[in-house]
A protein has these predicted regions:
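Nucleotidyltransferase catalytic core that binds NTPs
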Residues: 1-195
Length: 195
């Protein structure tokens, strides 16, 4: 459906839709840095969509909005020291995944590396976490989810099979090897000059 520039715009849009359809559509939320997006992220998002599309649980009129909250570049830089892909690119790619309704950024504030404030404002009915999270009570957002009546669903998309940090490290190692190979091919590896 849409990429929103912030949570406020999303909430305004949701309220407007509620006025038109006569009820407040529930939100099924998932979140992450998705930097870079990998198959584990994809499976978590696809499984979240599959849950939302379950006709036994949600008749088509009551299907929740599949909403993906994406951590901003500053959040990633503060947490892991870098961002690999821009927020805009990550949001657009996620928006292209079939069944995703809304994509919104989460902006880093006050050394808080959680999305608890976002959950407090959005008040989703469900919050899904990927395969590396198996104990709902052991996530930082557990308490706020309990306060707002949000069910936490863990292990979504299967077991953890990739790490964004690992992918970036592999890309860095590949680039270094390419530079070393180029230097060797130019004769720098034979003691002519250093590079």
């Amino acid at each position: 459906m849409a990429i929103f520039e912030n949570i406020e715009k999303f909430l305004e849009w949701r309220d407007l839709c509620s006025d038109v359809i006569g009820y407040h559509q529930a939100v099924m939320l998932t979140s992450g840095g998705f930097d870079p997006l990998h198959v584990g992220h994809l499976r978590c998002i696809q499984e979240t969509v599959k849950m939302a599309n379950n006709p036994k649980k949600f008749p088509s009129a009551n299907r929740p909005l599949v909403t993906v909250l994406v951590n901003c570049d500053d959040f990633l830089k503060a947490k892991k020291g870098y961002n690999f892909m821009s927020l805009e690119d990550r949001m657009e790619i996620i928006h292209g995944i079939a069944g995703v309704d809304c994509v919104l950024p989460w902006f880093y504030t006050n050394d808080d590396f959680t999305v608890t404030k976002a959950i407090h404002r959005i008040r989703p009915r469900w919050f899904t976490k990927g395969g590396d999270r198996t104990d709902a009570t052991n996530i930082p957002e557990w308490e706020i989810c309990q306060q707002v009546g949000c069910e936490v669903i863990t292990g979504v998309g299967g077991k953890k099979i990739r790490s964004s940090s690992e992918l970036v490290e592999n890309a860095d190692r590949f680039n270094l090897e390419a530079v070393e190979l180029a230097g060797w091919a130019a004769g720098y590896g034979e003691g002519k000059d250093s590079y």
